[in-house]
Amino acid sequence: MSSKEQLSMKFVKTHEDAKLPERAHDSDSGYDLYSVSEVIVPGDGSVVVPVGLTLGYLTPGWWFRVEPRSGLGFKHNLQPHLGIIDNGYRGDLGVKLYNFSNVNITLNKGTKIAQLVLYPHITAEVSFIDEAVEADRGDAGFGSTDYKSDMDTDKMSIYDNFKEYPSA
């Protein structure tokens, strides 16, 4: 894509009430997706929320991912299934929402349910090698860089740090 070429997303409207994804502010990275009908997301369950759109065209060399909206997660414990939408996908863009609370949540028609975030398409050559190339980290993982002095496992649970965040 040349520096003068405009990045373009074009959608096919599959429901009469569908809205184009849009950003609330010029500096926002995510394009909000809207529900086209009232939907009840069952407590401790999930549902696919229709948005009434199909991807019609995306500038070559780009793809997007369905990402959460922070307000739904913090206020209502709702999170979308993170989904990669490849440039060539032309199916329905319905969003699966998970409800991590134990109460049913009703989403009104027109609710912002998730956002699309664009990414450049980067690929790599994939191959086997006989041995791993040596690296500073080695095979250390799962908290290996935590400061051991920060935790006294005799006095606390790993979950104690999360008590300040109330559940919805």
Predicted regions and their residues:
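DUTPase catalytic domain/fold
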Residues: 1-168
